[in-house]
Amino acid sequence: MANIKSAKKRIKVIETKTLRNKMIKSALKTKIKNFEVAVANNDLNEAKSAYTIVVKALDMAAAKGILHKNKAARKKSRLATKLSGLNA
């Protein structure tokens, strides 16, 4: 346990940020799952709208530093491949 006042504050700040990051990651996983369900059901319109939502969420997570920008780009690429497979 920290004894210094600033260290105690940093612990509180880290806990707050960790909670926020977990919430954002959880919401992101839910959005990705919704997209994959739409793709599995061969619902093109639903998949397109879900894809735009997922891409926006991935970009925001990358901008906030929750995900690395390359990981976000990789996920977007793989989801786009699934979407294009649905178009064909």
Swiss-Prot record:
Homology family: Belongs to the bacterial ribosomal protein bS20 family.
InterPro entries in the cross-refs: Ribosomal_bS20 (IPR002583), Ribosomal_bS20_sf (IPR036510)
GO molecular function list: small ribosomal subunit rRNA binding; structural constituent of ribosome
Pfam families: Ribosomal_S20p
Signal peptide extent: none
GO cellular component, one term: small ribosomal subunit
The protein's name: Small ribosomal subunit protein bS20
Keywords: Ribonucleoprotein, Ribosomal protein, RNA-binding, rRNA-binding
GO terms of biological process kind: translation
Functional description taken from the UniProt entry: Binds directly to 16S ribosomal RNA.
